[in-house]
Amino acid sequence: MKYKDLRDFIAMLEQQGKLKRIAHPVSPHLEMTEIADRVLRAEGPALLFEHPVKPDGTRYDYPVLANLFGTPERVAMGMGADSVSKLREIGQTLAYLKEPEPPKGIKDAFSKLPLLKDIWSMAPNVVKNAPCQEIVWEGEDVDLYQLPIQHCWPEDVAPLVTWGLTVTRGPHKKRQNLGIYRQQLIGINKLIMRWLSHRGGALDYQEFRKLNPDTPYPVAVVLGCDPATILGAVTPVPDTLSEYQFAGLLRGSRTELVKCIGNDLQVPARAEIVLEGVIHPNETALEGPYGDHTGYYNEQDHFPVFTVERITMRENPIYHSTYTGKPPDEPAVLGVALNEVFVPLLQKQFPEITDFYLPPEGCSYRMAVVSMKKQYAGHAKRVMMGCWSFLRQFMYTKFIIVVDDDVDVRDWKEVIWAVTTRMDPVRDTVLMENTPIDYLDFASPVSGLGGKMGLDATNKWPGETDREWGRVIKKDPAVTAKIDEIWEELGL
């Protein structure tokens, strides 16, 4: 499914009946959230609000795109796959790139050449003239209030930029980092950059600040980027591969980049809107509270202030937005789809893993259920520790349930059956204190630091129990086949 940019993707969705245009005037203040939430819960289409209205009743100049990733199928489309199941192939590619195996022979080496050729042929293409710079606002012309920025929940402190793709670069680094961080609107040219300390953008900023304590730090924020680049920013791409290169691989065409007008950062040339600016030394502001993906309003905290010096955009740009709230929301749907990418990555490191599931009800990452082919006593605990430590995405996972491969991790009835019949609460529970936790998790005793629990719901091996272990009841296949043959005659 090849497409060039967000507009191309929108046209493809509309042609397939997967996008709905809303001509009725709708306010970004609460109303868009209400509509998008109802549509997402009904597994409905992406939405293009053509006439957003301001608080005074006048209209914004730009439409709002919402619920773009409201179904796993649309996430898969954005990643260039024709079904959610095909996302595992993307995971297999990432697993190979993360830890490539030496070829087993000449034939095996040649079989890998097409993949490697495809990957390296997708290096970004830098252009001089770009659609995203057709219109330029600078100086006093910069006015973030002219953008239809969504105010999602009644007790949110201010409008919030939600799908901003933040582009940064650390000192002495060639590769740029892409991250999605929410940004509170606090002034005509001011946003609060809420990035957690371990995230790529924050790390780049911290390194820069150590070497340049008095120098403004350049940042670019892309609004209305193509889906492949957005999804590349939230996928565990190996450090040897840039997100822009990975996006090209997903999209089936090289990512076109252009240098920002005011700094050396490169942004997608066909993006809708780009905010260029700096973070000044020691300029922070109190962020929040906001309703977030947990279903609660989060605590306030101080984060750096992003000063927007320039806004560039396409002719008639589209503003891309979303909301986060109690699952299901778009992040939860993204989690369901990206789950399929994670499975091959984990299996590469732990071949005994047969499936892995992040229940969307668990806020996409706070609980994981893993099935495995158990081979020895204590094996389940090894897998628990591996899942917590292997991918950065699972650093904040609070609960991991491990089951045998006869249990469907996506069926809660099966999982609860395993937990209640194969677990002893004392012997089979692993508890850890003072581990990294999402600072939005107000249940932890300290902000950013809390506990983890592992539940070993596997059958126990000698060494783990001295008792005779129960045998699973199974039907007689011959009797089942016989009853199948006469079932219609029974009239049941």
UniProtKB/Swiss-Prot annotation:
Cofactor requirement: prenylated FMN; Mn(2+)
Pfam families: UbiD, UbiD_C, UbiD_N
Gene name for this UniProt entry: ubiD
Chain's role: Catalyzes the decarboxylation of 3-octaprenyl-4-hydroxy benzoate to 2-octaprenylphenol, an intermediate step in ubiquinone biosynthesis.
EC number: 4.1.1.98
Active site (UniProt): D292
Protein name from the UniProt record: 3-octaprenyl-4-hydroxybenzoate carboxy-lyase
Binding site for Mn(2+): N177, E243
Record keywords: Cell membrane, Decarboxylase, Flavoprotein, FMN, Lyase, Manganese, Membrane, Metal-binding, Ubiquinone biosynthesis
Reaction equations catalysed: a 4-hydroxy-3-(all-trans-polyprenyl)benzoate + H(+) = a 2-(all-trans-polyprenyl)phenol + CO2
Recorded topology in the membrane: Peripheral membrane protein
Gene3D superfamilies: Single helix bin, UbiD C-terminal domain-like
Protein family (similarity comment): Belongs to the UbiD family.
Protein localization: Cell membrane
Example of a GO cellular component annotation carried by this entry: plasma membrane
Pathway(s) the chain acts in: Cofactor biosynthesis; ubiquinone biosynthesis
Residues where prenylated FMN binds: I180, Y181, R182, R194, W195, L196, R199, G200
Species name: Neisseria meningitidis serogroup A / serotype 4A (strain DSM 15465 / Z2491)
